[in-house]
């Protein structure tokens, strides 16, 4: 069970969908406690309670949290995390909605 990210452009035009897979979520939140230091990561910790929207400024802060937590998770998750960061870094994306199951 992963988290779903829906991405939107200008005027709330739907762009794409990306999943934060369960294994990456576990690496971010269950293999260490450092996520508590990152405001935007704390917002997506709970599968069942997560239902957040980030505007472009918040997306950039979320990306910074992802970049900063990289050193605390196993290296085999680096490709998935780097891909997520690359996708979210597109400034065509103006808003994201992250929802759990």
Show where each model-derived region lies.
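Acidic (Asp/Glu-rich) sequence patches and key acidic residues
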Residues: 1-101
């Amino acid at each position: 069970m992963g988290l779903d990210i829906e991405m939107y452009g200008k005027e709330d035009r739907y762009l794409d969908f990306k999943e934060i897979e369960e294994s990456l979520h576990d690496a971010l939140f269950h293999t260490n406690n450092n996520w508590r230091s990152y405001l935007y990561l704390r917002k997506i910790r709970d599968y069942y309670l997560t239902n957040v929207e980030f505007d472009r400024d918040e997306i950039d802060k979320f990306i910074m949290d992802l970049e900063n937590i990289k050193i605390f998770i196993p290296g085999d998750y680096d490709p998935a995390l780097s891909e997520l960061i690359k996708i979210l870094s597109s400034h065509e994306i103006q808003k994201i909605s992250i929802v759990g199951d």
